[in-house]
Amino acid sequence: MNTPQEIYQLSYDYMFVVFAGTGATFFYNLFSNILRALGDSKTPLYFLVISSLLNIFLDILFIVPFKMGVAGAAWATVLSQLISAVLCALYAVKHFPVTRLKKEDWKSNAETHAKHLKIAFPMGFQMSVMCIGQLAMQSAVNKIGTNAIAGYTAASKIDQMSILVNNAFGITISNYVAQNYGAGLIGRIKKGVKSCLMIGHAGNLFMGILILATQSFVIPIFMNEPNEEIFLYAKDYLWVIVPFYLLLGLLAIYRSSIQSMGDSVTPFLACIIELFSRIFCALYLSLYFGYKGICFSTPFAWIGALCILIPVYYRTIRKISLEKMSKGNYSNLKRKIRKV
């Protein structure tokens, strides 16, 4: 990872806290997805917003008044997810009796485990591929120096707000498409995706303007002490990444829609393209353009993934529509024959 020796211990402290708190992340995702599976997509979104705002508040609290440094940032992440996990669990148990487990529910079922693993392994591998790309970027940033690392980290914290918003769009359209795909309502899928894209564009435009307008005030919040070089590194990252937020919205919505129509291969291939795009930019663009070349690796990765996701989405919609039309024509023909 090319981590500078002077910040190795800080990195170790952050990683130790985050890995120790993996259970909080697991249970938060578990209960929020249980609620979505039971048809309640609004409540997990509310808890996601609460978790994000709480994370930002705790970041400021632990870093500024308490002087806990990077370990404080890690604790802020873990505690915000833990609190949200508890809220999700309490809400689920209170409002959905099916989540109140009995003794017999704890019996092991090999068939159920196999079904879960069949879905979990591809998704887990997909997320791992995305993380490898981010590690390549971080490794390239680490070569530049500690100020670049601090600036990149501060900007990433701010950028995370937009990522969470777009993930929410992806989760929303995923549930919507899955329900309508199961019911064979292709027209509703097209309308829903179109509406989500429009809302996503508006949301990303607003988020982008807000971030760029307030960056001079927000960036210092995530800095331990005033430093002009760190500030400029963070600012450069935001000016590169923010104008491409519209692509992030497209990526989240199209990928989730395709997955919800039963295609797990295409999103996986899109992740592979993202991975190689990030690695290529991190290794080669950084040689010619330095830090800004690394920053551009994320937008290039989004563009690469969209090159496969967008055509596949519209081809899938067209294919399903034609199949439905053929079945409808066949049914009409059978009715006419019966009448004769």
Please name every model-derived segment.
Residues 5-28, 228-251:
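Alpha-helical transmembrane segments of multi-pass membrane proteins
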Residues 52-86, 217, 275-307, 311:
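Membrane-interface helix-loop junctions in multi-pass transport and translocation proteins
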Residues 1-16, 208-228:
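Short membrane-interface helical motifs at transmembrane helix boundaries
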Residues 25-44, 151-215, 248-262, 266-270:
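Small-residue-rich hydrophobic transmembrane alpha-helices
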